[in-house]
Swiss-Prot record:
Organism of provenance: Beta vulgaris (Sugar beet)
Tissue: Localized to infected area.
EC number: 3.2.1.14
Pfam families, sorted: Chitin_bind_1 (PF00187), Glyco_hydro_19 (PF00182)
Cysteine pairs bridged by disulfides in the record: 30-38, 32-44, 37-51, 56-61, 107-154, 168-178, 256-288
Catalytic activity: Random endo-hydrolysis of N-acetyl-beta-D-glucosaminide (1->4)-beta-linkages in chitin and chitodextrins
Lineage: Eukaryota, Viridiplantae, Streptophyta, Embryophyta, Tracheophyta
Function: Defense against chitin-containing fungal pathogens.
Signal peptide annotation: 1-27
Subcellular localization(s) per the UniProt record: Secreted, Extracellular space
Active site residues according to the UniProt entry: 149
Protein name: Acidic endochitinase SP2
Length: 288
């Protein structure tokens, strides 16, 4: 057999072996062909392990909704960050009850808000991307703001919201058109407001925010999910700047730079209390 023939046969054999590899072994950085899905573990392929809901981060995912890519690790409690404590460990039933227990029996939120609904709404990155102290501070900040906004989870809707402003931003109405007869005043734990926030929250968590804004006040799971959406979209990324930055992200136009200091200080006092409950220092830059 000639050397040329041998080389040709070896090349053919190599190509044959490579071609027989499953498609899932290629493109670990997800440079997949258009017809292949990229799994959460960074492999290309087809079928439920690659394209299924919860398994797919890009490509023709089933349901059309890619998930956030994950890295294979030793299984841990969901929501556990670098410090080893999960959100559910930190937000115990006793902690939650300690907040809502301060609300009067006549408060509408008393029989609406639940710890279970909060936990079901928790984003995987919430209280889960920093040190143990960082994670506890974020959770303390979240509950400080919802305690302020709802007066210890007493209120579901903005007081007198149904007779007040419609919160329809006309500058954004072309993109987020306000529905006839609907008002986009504060609802839920973070008092979600304005037509554009309702629209975007609805798109993110799956409800008609413009046509049915009332759902944030009637369905507790939607209520907490809308609050978590707002937090992760607008607040989560500034936690490393201190609590003051979170106030600025939520209501900076009215409570920063010396404005409405009683309101801003109320948030700070809640934050300090919850940090103390979690055994963590509140850190610097508490004001905005």
């Amino acid at each position: 057999m000639t050397l040329l023939l041998k080389n040709t046969l070896y090349l053919a054999l190599i190509i044959s072996v490579i071609s027989s590899f499953p498609t899932s072994l290629f493109a670990q950085n997800c440079g997949c062909a258009p017809n292949l899905c990229c799994s959460n573990f960074g492999f290309c392929g087809t079928g439920t392990p690659y394209c299924g809901v919860g398994n797919c981060q890009s490509g023709p995912c089933e349901g059309g909704t890619p998930t956030t890519p994950t890295t294979p690790t030793t299984p841990t409690t969901p929501g556990t960050g670098g410090g080893g404590s999960s959100v559910s460990d930190i937000v115990s039933q006793a902690f939650f009850d300690g907040i809502i227990g301060q609300a009067a029996a006549s408060c509408p939120g008393k029989n609406f808000y639940t710890r279970a609904a909060f936990l079901s709404a928790v984003d995987p990155k919430f209280g889960n991307e920093g040190s143990s102290d960082d994670n506890k501070r974020e959770i303390a900040a979240f509950f400080a703001h919802i305690s302020h906004e709802t007066t210890n989870l007493c209120h579901i809707e903005e007081r007198d919201g149904d007779v007040g402003d419609a919160y329809c931003d006309q500058d954004k109405a072309a993109q987020y058109p306000c529905a006839a007869g609907k008002k986009y005043y504060g609802r839920g734990p973070l008092q979600l407001s304005w037509n554009y926030n309702y629209a975007l929250a609805g798109q993110a968590i799956g409800f008609d925010g413009l046509g049915n804004p009332e759902k944030v006040a009637t369905d507790v799971n939607t209520s907490f999910k809308a609050a978590m959406w707002f937090w992760m979209t607008n607040v989560h990324s500034v936690m490393n700047q201190g609590f003051g930055a979170t106030t600025k992200a939520i209501n900076g136009a009215l409570e920063c730079n010396g404005q409405n200091q009683d309101q801003a200080n109320d948030r700070i006092q809640f934050y300090k209390k919850y940090c103390a409950d979690f055994g963590v220092a509140p850190g610097d830059n508490l004001t905005c």
